[in-house]
Amino acid sequence: MSLVSVIVPTYNRRETIQAAIASVQRQTFPDWELIVVDDGSTDGTADMIAGSDPRLVLMHQQNQGVNGARNVGMLRARGRYIAFLDSDDEWLPHHLELSMAFFRAFPGEDFLSGEFCEDWGPAGSVHFLHSALTEWYPPLAKRAGSSLLQLPAGVSDPFRRVFASVEPIGDWGRDIVARTPYGDARLYRGRVFEHMRFGFLFALQPTVLTRRAREAVGLFDRRYRIGADYSYLAKLCRRFSANFLALPMAIKYEYARDGTRLNEGHLSTGPTRFEFERDLLHQFEELFAAERSPDREIIALRRERQLVVGRAALRQGNRVEALHYLGRARKGRAAPSAAALWWLVRIAPSAAAAHRLYTRSQRAWVLGKKLLRGLTLWCRIARTAWSRLCCTLTLKRGT
C-alpha cells in the first residue's frame, strides 16, 4: 500500500493532464498512488493517460463536477496521507518529500500546506498567500474595521498577520530545501480558522492531510460546483492547527503551454466568475453564521463579499443578480460604491448597456489613478527642483 494517495479530478483537460501527471512522476518521494477521476470527459483525456504508469488508478464517472470527482477519489484512496492536484496544475519536485519529512518530524500534526505560484501567462506570476497578506487582505480588514490582521509589534513578516509562530526548517527538512531553487524557507504554525473570514489562506494543490483529518472533516460539499475547497480548508483549520511552509510547492496555471486560455469551466475567472464568487459568499455565511451574526466585522465582510458578487454578475451582464447582490451590499460600509453601481444597473436600458458603462467607468477610474500618480510625481519633482533653485540663489547672494 502506498503511503500517499494523490487525488486528481479531471474534465476535458487533454492539453494539460500529461504535464500534471509528469509533475507527480518527478517527485523525489516515490511512494505514492495516483488516483485520476475522469469526470465524464469528451475530449479523449482518459484515453491519453490510460496505462501510462502502473501507479495510476484511472476511474470514470458521469459528469458530477470537480467536488464529486474529488470525493470519489478520496473514498478510493488507500494511503495514510492524502494530497491534491488539479489536472491543469503541477507540483514542484520537492513537494511530497518535504511534506513527508514534516509529518515524520511532527507526527501529531494533521495537515500541511505551502505557498503556491499562480502563473498568469503574459501577465506574470504571483505567490498567492504572500500577495494576499501584503496587498489584498489588509485593505479588506481595514474597511471591515478588523484588527485581526495587524502585525505584532516590531514584526514586518506578512505571514505573521495570520500565524502565531515561525521557526526555521529543522534538520528534518533543511537538506531538502537546500536542493530547491529557493534555498531557504520557514515553517509557520497556528490556529487560523478566524482568519479564513478574509478568504483563502491555502490552496488544495500544495496541501497534504492525514487520513485522520480526512475522516474528521469528511468530503467536499457537492452543493458548490466551484470553490468548495474554501469551506473544506476552513473546516480543516477549525478542527486542526495549521502548518505552512513559505516556499512554493505547486504552480497553478491559467494558460496552456501554447499560450491559450484554459477551459474556464473549473476556474474562478471568466464565465464562471459569478458562480464562484456567489458560492464563496454562501460558504462564508455558513462558516461564520453571517446571516445572524451580531459581529459588526462579519457583517461588514459579508457586505464586501456581496459587492464582489454583484460586480461579477454585472461583468457577465446578469442584471437580476447584479441588482440583488448590489442591493444587499449597499446597506453596509461598501454602500457608496455598491449604491452607485446599483443605480447604474437600474437606469441602464439593458444588462449589456450596464456592463458597458461599468467597464468604461472602471477603465476611467484606473486611468484617473494613473494620471493622479503621474501628476503627484511631477509636483514632487517640481517642488524639489524649486527648493534646490532657491537654495542655490540664497548661497550666491550670501557670497
Model-identified regions with their sequence ranges:
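Acidic helix N-cap motif at the loop->helix transition within catalytic regions
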Residues: 15-18, 43-51, 90, 94
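Acidic donor-binding/catalytic loop of UDP-sugar-dependent glycosyltransferases
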Residues: 44, 89-102, 120-121
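A conserved hydrophobic helix/loop-capping motif in glycosyltransferases and polysaccharide synthases
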Residues: 4-16, 20, 27, 37
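Glycine-rich, basic loop-to-helix element that forms the pyrophosphate-binding segment
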Residues: 61-77, 98
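Short aromatic/hydrophobic "clamp" motif used to bind/position activated sugar donors
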Residues: 82
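A conserved acidic beta->alpha catalytic loop
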Residues: 23, 30, 38-47, 86
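Catalytic core of nucleotide-sugar-dependent glycosyltransferases
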Residues: 135-144, 248-256, 261-293, 314-332
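Conserved nucleotide-sugar donor-binding catalytic segment
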Residues: 114, 140-273
